[in-house]
């Protein structure tokens, strides 16, 4: 089997776990394909690398491994998805980060998790992506996001107005710091911190969430992911910031922007002990009470 590995810098206490992961994968005779920048970081951490491995820097170099392991937190997993794109490579997150809604495999359970991956004892959860359409070639071939599309003011000056349309029909003019369109997967991310609802990843919806709206009557809205959402932007500053997950670009107010569901999905690995509702309870501390 061939495993691709991608990661970001992690805290020092994760070094023994990452070293053990590499050792155990070698023991199981797994072939390695490691992101080139991650190799450089592992060398800096004095982590002993496999005796033989190849590297990749982009989707073309990646080829077709059996699995991709994302070593980090949710942000690392979102970045890993950009290497996979439409190739249907199963993606699993080894959590060396903090919260871990998506990177759900604990570092303490590496051997058992690797055994499940090798034996194929896991399920795949198809995750919808959101695609950006614009009259400029923004983000190149990576014009999709697993969590959310964000349209925000560029600096800390006055708010912006985002005129929003669904399938050509006017929805609302949001006077706010910005606007989010999130996938169900992204409902536990930026949207949640802006007051958006939790939406199960198997539902076929998008969540439109204003960021700090001036009108307190404006609330998040759930719409079908079959719709086409377009925007017109106004503001004192003629430049604005748009982002797809953690990738951002500056655009002018005269640009035409819209989003819709991407044609392909990301295959997220769910191991035997994974439970979506348990993850919500543990990560959001549901049921905790100082009186207990």
UniProtKB/Swiss-Prot annotation:
Main localization (coarse): cytoplasm
Biological processes, Gene Ontology terms: NAD metabolic process; NADP biosynthetic process
NCBIfam families xrefs: PRK01911.1
Pfam family, one: NAD_kinase_C
Kinase keyword on record: yes
PANTHER family: NAD KINASE
Positions of the catalytic residues: 74
Binding site for NAD(+): 74-75, 147-148, 177, 188-193
Taxonomic source organism: Cytophaga hutchinsonii (strain ATCC 33406 / DSM 1761 / CIP 103989 / NBRC 15051 / NCIMB 9469 / D465)
Localization, UniProt: Cytoplasm
InterPro entries for the chain: ATP-NAD_kinase_N, ATP-NAD_kinase_PpnK-typ_C, NAD/diacylglycerol_kinase_sf, NADK
Known cofactor(s): a divalent metal cation
GO molecular function, one term: ATP binding
Descriptive protein name: NAD kinase
HAMAP family, per database record: NAD_kinase
Protein family membership: Belongs to the NAD kinase family.
Listed GO CC annotations: cytoplasm
Keywords annotated in UniProt: ATP-binding, Cytoplasm, Kinase, NAD, NADP, Nucleotide-binding, Transferase
Record function comment: Involved in the regulation of the intracellular balance of NAD and NADP, and is a key enzyme in the biosynthesis of NADP. Catalyzes specifically the phosphorylation on 2'-hydroxyl of the adenosine moiety of NAD to yield NADP.
Top-level EC class as recorded in UniProt: transferase
Domain of life assignment: Bacteria
SUPFAM superfamilies: NAD kinase/diacylglycerol kinase-like
E.C. number: 2.7.1.23
Recorded catalytic activity of this chain's protein: NAD(+) + ATP = ADP + NADP(+) + H(+)
